Amino acid sequence: MKKLNTANRYLHLNLVIFILLGLIFTCGTAQTSAVGWDQVPAILEKIVPPKFNNKDFDITKFGAIGNGKFDCTQAFVRAVEACHQAGGGRVIVPSGEFLTGAIQLKSNVNLHVTGEGVILFSKDTRKFLPVVYTRFEGMECMNYSPFIYAYEQENLAITGSGVIDGQADNETWWNWVVKKEYGWKEGLPNQEADRDLLLKMADDNIPVNERVFGDGHYLRPNFIQFYKCKNILIENVTLKRSPMWEIHPVLCENMTVRKVTIVSHGPNNDGCNPESCRNVLIKDCYFDTGDDCIAIKSGRNGDGRRIKVPSENIIIQGCRMKDGHGGVVIGSEMSGDVRNIFAENCIMDSPNLDRALRIKTNSLRGGVVENIYMRDVTVGVVSDAVVRIYFYYAEGDVGQYTPVVRNVYIENVSSKQSKYALLLEGYERSPIANVQLKNCRFDGVKKSSIIKNVRDLNMKDVYINGELQ
């Protein structure tokens, strides 16, 4: 009997030790692997704006004349090169209007546009040649240079309270889109054939250096693009009249976009589109755009799957959205996956804003979108749904790459007027999974929510037109 008691005591002791070790391991894991909003402080610690030498390089000292007519392209080239060779500093755009072609930045250069300074980009498309390594709608190609461009550089900035004006309009760039409201007319050249060709090249895995567009073709460049760069700051400037996407970092890391004003109503005039980027902060910006205000991307179709770099750890704080197709958007070019997106303390309000949170995809894109967080967002009027997750975007369900969307958390979001509160539509074979809404109020809703193929939709303290859901 004593032997049995002793054995029991050893068994109990071993069990207690096992439980204690399990608790210690669990606690340790919880402390080192934060989830949800608890991840934000650690991400913010990794996002550090670059610092620059206290040296100024005024473009007028390199031949620029600010009368809005003189071609200052070479003055910008010389100023950027001198700043770079000196170890970095600021390239100063003083008072005046400075006409230029493409500006290519180099490491340790801060392009600083003073309060009375304006950069005017040329309406001559040849000023954006030779072609550079870039992306058009999520596909790699050699095309017209983005208006401000950098490739494989680090410690870069665009700052100052001045204006950067792309001068795109219905006579230049915009009319390459087949839409009469943007100046296109029957018989004029347009982007459709080139766009289809690039899609085929990407799907056929044609080498990028053989995907040459530019002169004689009609794919528009982006406004600002940093490609494979790190340690970036864009702050205080105002952007106007872009050919298409405004701020478009690709394969970048450690980027801050702060207190930027974007007012541009052309076709595909998205405000800020991080693509395959990591550790990005978009804070206190104003968006009034012709397309999505912020759209997070990771490559389109075959190219996105080939490169396979997700966008992740992107924080959006304190922004104001007016016109646009969506306030915070993911997709549709997201074949390389998107995860860990945090949007908080934003205001969205315009009858010309379609949605507050939008995830758009289809079975040509594929990809996984997960861990999307939105809280403390005030929505006035949107014309469509406050929250829209839609698997039938554009081409619809015609591909072989079934998308996955899961873990979407929405808290303390209110709206005054919309067509729908929620429009959630996944596939039967791939339902939208785990959508959590808490403490939300959607008023002035005209139609019942559309919810199809959604698994684990949970609503706590959610009111639609005053009724608890």
Describe the function of each predicted region.
Residues 2-16:
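Bacterial N-terminal signal peptides that target proteins for export
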Residues 14-469:
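Extracellular/periplasmic carbohydrate-active domains that bind, remodel
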